[in-house]
């Protein structure tokens, strides 16, 4: 996001980077804002947003651009419990639609809840690659 742009301007800016036309963004704008729950702040510069607000807006844009692959990098670690659960439900919906979701996390519960495959990286190298349950089990044993 551009820190001096408002949340609304950043929606247009970022959605256009993902290839959406102005008309497509116009059609999705209210849905994006509503999901983010930032209605009262959407016209403020994002530099005034907390990390949780920033994450809400980023996630809301990402899930509304119809990408085939969604990359979630520790993004849900800053949101409140209500919004996290809302995001988790959306992730489950996207997974059910056959979307590919790549989650970067240190949360093994998150890995086991959403992933069929897990890759454990250690010092920039793949330490283990396999089904989520097996990888998280070994990870927890070795890092305890």
Q: For each predicted feature, which ranges?
A:
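Conserved ABC ATPase "signature" region
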Residues: 12, 16, 24-41, 58
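Conserved ABC ATPase "signature" C-loop
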Residues: 123-124, 139
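Helical segment within the ABC ATPase nucleotide-binding domain
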Residues: 84-97
């Amino acid at each position: 996001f551009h820190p001096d742009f408002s949340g609304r301007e950043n929606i247009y800016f970022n959605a256009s980077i993902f290839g959406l036309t102005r008309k497509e963004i116009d059609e999705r704008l209210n849905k994006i804002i509503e999901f983010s729950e930032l209605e009262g702040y959407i016209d403020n510069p994002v530099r005034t947003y907390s990390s949780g607000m920033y994450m809400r807006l980023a996630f809301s844009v990402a899930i509304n651009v119809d990408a085939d692959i969604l990359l979630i990098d520790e993004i849900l670690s800053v949101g409140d419990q209500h919004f996290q659960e809302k995001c988790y439900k959306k992730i489950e919906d996207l997974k059910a639609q056959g979307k590919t979701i790549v989650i970067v996390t240190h949360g093994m519960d998150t890995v086991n809840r959403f992933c069929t495959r897990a890759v454990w990286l250690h010092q920039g190298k793949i330490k283990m690659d396999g089904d989520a349950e097996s990888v998280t089990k070994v990870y927890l044993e070795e890092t305890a």
